[in-house]
């Protein structure tokens, strides 16, 4: 996705500005389909987007209806999921399993144009909070939890319009979960009240992302009623991929952090050593990782 943010300088460096191919005309796949390279399209009634920088070992599979599954490991960044194009102020229902080991998140993810904005409603993440280092603009109580609202800025980064500078809007759920209803109209209104302006909607998916990590997920996406807000849209000419400028953290566990785990960074109170065969490497001022 361009998936975590300028917030996270490490991913900005690690994730290249590769754009996945645009959706091909008539690309309607009605059977189980597995990808290991970037792709976008329509599958069994849902839009899908899958992006990888080519580094990790990742297998993304479109399954029946709104369901997809993914397994991943290794060095690099990827992001994928199912949803809609265009996005809208809809209520999104989803269920599934999500088992990350290290840097990862689960979120409703999308873009708007005019202005160009990348946005996230983060439902779950690894052991590194994607809002680390960002300025909190407020909060919203919806869908059984508080979500804190943030804005970050990316400069000369990959986007659905090529290499551009743009804002990122974030709602980060305090009580992490896997499954439930996400009222996007409520989040859009909260962002508007915080002075964050959205444009014409491009795609909107329930995304899983991994960055120098491993794990697996199976997510089933559904839709609900559409609320207010800008439902205009258009098909993105290319998916910049999930380049999460975000560096979610690893799992410390034990006396030393395991491979992919966090081992340092401003505000880190966990282990600063790494398991045998790995080295603690600084990604940015907020995050160091065992690689």
Curated annotation (Swiss-Prot):
SUPFAM superfamilies, sorted: Cellulose-binding domain (SSF57180), Concanavalin A-like lectins/glucanases (SSF49899)
GO biological process, any: xylan catabolic process
Annotated catalytic residues: 118, 209
MF annotations from Gene Ontology: cellulose binding; endo-1,4-beta-xylanase activity
Domain CBM1: 255-291
GO terms under cellular component: extracellular region
Pathway: Glycan degradation; xylan degradation
Activity regulation behaviour: The activity iss completely inhibited by Hg(2+), a metal ion that interacts with Trp and oxidizes the indole ring, and is significantly enhanced by beta-mercaptoethanol, which counteracts the oxidation effects of the S-S linkage between Cys residues.
Segments forming domain GH11: 34-222
Cleaved signal peptide residues: 1-19
Biotechnology remark: The SDS tolerance and neutral to alkaline preference are important for application in the detergent and textile solutions. Moreover, its alkaline-active, cellulose activity-free characteristics make XYN11B preferred for biobleaching of paper pulp.
Entry-listed glycosylation sites: 93
Temperature-related behavior of activity: Optimum temperature is 50 degrees Celsius.
Record EC number: 3.2.1.8
Chief location of this protein within or outside the cell: secreted
InterPro entries cross-referenced by the UniProt entry: CBD_sf, Cellulose-bd_dom_fun, ConA-like_dom_sf, GH11/12, GH11_AS_1, GH11_AS_2, GH11_dom, Glyco_hydro_11
Functional pH dependence: Optimum pH is 6.0.
Stored Pfam families: CBM_1, Glyco_hydro_11
Keyword Protein biosynthesis in annotation: no
This protein's domain notes: The CBM1 domain assists the catalytic domain to bind to insoluble and crystalline polysaccharides and is thus required for enzyme activity on insoluble substrates.
Annotated function: Endo-1,4-beta-xylanase involved in the hydrolysis of xylan, a major structural heterogeneous polysaccharide found in plant biomass representing the second most abundant polysaccharide in the biosphere, after cellulose. Shows maximum activity on soluble wheat arabinoxylan (defined as 100%), moderate activity on birchwood xylan (80.5%) and beechwood xylan (76.2%), and weak activity on insoluble wheat arabinoxylan (7.0%). Has no activity towards glucan or carboxymethyl cellulose-sodium (CMC-Na).
PANTHER family hit by this protein: ENDO-1,4-BETA-XYLANASE (PTHR46828:SF3), ENDO-1,4-BETA-XYLANASE A-RELATED (PTHR46828)
Descriptive protein name: Endo-1,4-beta-xylanase 11B
Organism: Humicola insolens
Organism placement in taxonomy: Eukaryota, Fungi, Dikarya, Ascomycota, Pezizomycotina
Gene name tied to this protein: Xyn11B
């Amino acid at each position: 996705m361009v998936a975590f943010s300028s917030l996270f300088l490490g991913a900005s460096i690690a994730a290249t500005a590769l754009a996945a191919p645009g959706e091909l005309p008539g690309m309607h796949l009605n059977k189980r389909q597995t990808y290991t390279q970037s792709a976008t399209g329509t599958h069994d009634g849902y839009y899908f987007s899958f992006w990888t920088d080519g580094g990790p070992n990742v297998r993304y599979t479109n399954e029946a209806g709104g369901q997809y599954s993914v397994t991943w490991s290794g060095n690099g960044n990827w992001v994928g999921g199912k949803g809609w194009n265009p996005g809208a102020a809809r209520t999104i229902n989803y269920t599934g399993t999500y088992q990350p080991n290290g840097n990862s998140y689960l979120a409703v993810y999308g873009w708007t144009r005019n202005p160009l904005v990348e946005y996230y409603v983060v439902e779950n993440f690894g052991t590194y909070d994607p809002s680390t280092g960002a300025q909190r603009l407020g909060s919203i109580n919806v869908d059984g939890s508080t979500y804190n609202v943030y804005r970050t800025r990316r400069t000369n980064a990959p986007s659905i319009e090529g290499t551009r500078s743009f804002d990122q809007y974030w709602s980060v759920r305090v009580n992490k979960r896997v499954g439930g209803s996400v009222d996007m109209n409520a989040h859009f209104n909260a962002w508007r009240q915080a002075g964050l302006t959205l444009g014409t909607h491009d795609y909107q998916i329930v995304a899983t992302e991994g960055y120098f990590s491993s794990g697996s997920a199976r997510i089933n996406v559904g839709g609900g009623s559409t609320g207010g807000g800008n439902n205009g849209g258009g098909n993105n000419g290319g998916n910049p991929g999930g380049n999460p400028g975000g560096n979610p953290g690893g799992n410390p566990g034990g006396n030393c952090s395991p491979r992919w785990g966090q081992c340092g960074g401003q505000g880190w109170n966990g282990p600063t050593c790494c398991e045998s065969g790995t080295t603690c490497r600084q990604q940015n001022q907020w995050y160091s990782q065992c690689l």
